[in-house]
Design a protein with these regions (language model features):
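Long, distal/terminal scaffolding or interaction modules
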Residues: 1-146
Length: 146
């Protein structure tokens, strides 16, 4: 079912749950993080390999994966989002700062980068760096080819 923890969840290899994963602070795995439903952290989410959720992925700080990030719903981070490969969201992507990946970004709806509300982001912090935005509309942010 769900993994819920008041502070941090940290694993040398994988974190996997049939339903959801939720931590009051951060979630970190040396390999991958996978949940049948959603993944939520009050602070950051970091995986040496991929991050995958049947529904949404949400972090108060940043989201970082050595490989890809995939969510059936939306992906949201208070800071930036970074993936070694591609990023795929069933709905949209919203990041307080930049979104970066080496391959493609695929979403059904909209993409927002650099929408932090507590200060004005620099031009660098509004960049969406990828090979190509395959689908979806860039509502806010500057697309830069990886």
């Amino acid at each position: 079912r769900c993994i819920t923890f008041g502070r941090c969840i940290k694993a040398g290899r994988c974190i996997e749950a049939g339903w959801g994963i939720k931590a009051g602070r951060g979630i970190e795995a040396g390999w991958g993080i996978e949940a049948g439903w959603g993944i939520e952290a009050g602070e950051g989410i970091k995986a040496g390999l991929g991050i995958e959720a049947g529904e949404g992925i949400e972090a108060g700080w940043g989201i970082e994966a050595g490989l890809g990030i995939e969510a059936g719903g939306g992906i949201e981070a208070g800071w930036g989002i970074e993936a070694g490969w591609g990023i795929e969201a069933g709905w949209g992507i919203k990041a307080g700062f930049q979104i970066t990946c080496l391959l493609d970004i695929t979403v059904r709806l909209r993409i927002f980068a650099g929408v932090c509300t507590w200060r004005l982001p620099s031009e660098e912090e509004t960049k969406i760096t990828c090979r190509i935005v395959k689908s979806g509309t860039v509502a806010f942010g500057l697309v830069v080819k990886a």
